[in-house]
Curated annotation (Swiss-Prot):
Organism of this sequence: Drosophila teissieri
Official protein name in the record: Andropin
One GO CC term on file: extracellular region
Alphabetical UniProt keywords: Antibiotic, Antimicrobial, Immunity, Innate immunity, Secreted, Signal
UniProt family annotation: Belongs to the andropin family.
Tissue/organ expression: Ejaculatory duct of adult males.
Keyword Oxidoreductase: no
Subcellular location: Secreted
Induction of its expression: In response to mating.
Protein role: Male-specific peptide with moderate activity against Gram-positive bacteria.
Domain of life: Eukaryota
One GO process term, biological-process aspect: innate immune response
Amino acid sequence: MKYFSVLVVLTLILAIVDQSDAFINLLDKVEDALHTGAQAGFKLIRPVERGATPKKSEKPEK
């Protein structure tokens, strides 16, 4: 949700300021950084989830 909010705010600023090349380049870099950070976060979360879930132990039948 924060990612979406940041993009909305930056888009509104872009509409107000006018479309200058420098500002568009800055907006692209911020979007890329947020996207890369989100991907890195998901890559870190998955192994933690796997380690946190208990493994099912198979009990031998008697």
